[in-house]
Amino acid sequence: VSTQETLSVDQAVARAVALAEAGGRSVVGIAGAPGAGKSTLARRVVTEVTDRLGAGVAVQVPMDGFHLANTALDALGRRDRKGAIDTFDAAGYVALVRRLTAADGTGGTDGTGSTVWAPDFDRRVDEPVAGSIAVPPETVLVVSEGNYLLDRTAPWRELPGLFTETWACVVDDSVRIDRLVGRHMRHGRDHEGARRWAVEVDGANAVRVTADLHRASVLVRT
């Protein structure tokens, strides 16, 4: 990890602006453990690039849109550890990233010049929502964040070769856990339940994610 460049959030934003201005399409993957600040960083990047270069230039496409539905997780017996690597449609996510990068350098999306529609995740109902995010042909920066973008198992391991760059969010564990407890409480858990989920379920996922962060292009201190 010591050989990787470590950026501040401001430096990461500047790097994203440079990618957006470089011509063609760049797709940046942001990895990190639960609560590391991936979505916050992705939103900041997209907001600042949009402010500088115009609407539609940058779009955020979260990996969380590929969560399996709760009914599917119930059927598989995995609902009690939602967020683990086998609770996502991994092949579906990789296929979407391929579509987003297929016409790299042309400003197209999947080679057809048409808009690509991506799913989002609605935390209010704790479910993925299909066809929520438009990525039009003129988009030159796609930012996609998720836990497992650097995982070494199939099909996840294909992703680093598809992204223009991969960024890994790094943060102190105590800060990360506090963020998770707050998030889980906002979505209905009591403090004890929120902390248990953050330490046990999210914690197990964090161990897996952290082991692969050395594969990122750069680290971002979040």
Where do the PLM segments sit?
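Conserved lysine of the Walker
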Residues: 38
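Post-Walker A helix-loop "phosphate-sensing" segment adjacent to the P-loop in P-loop NTPases
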Residues: 47-59
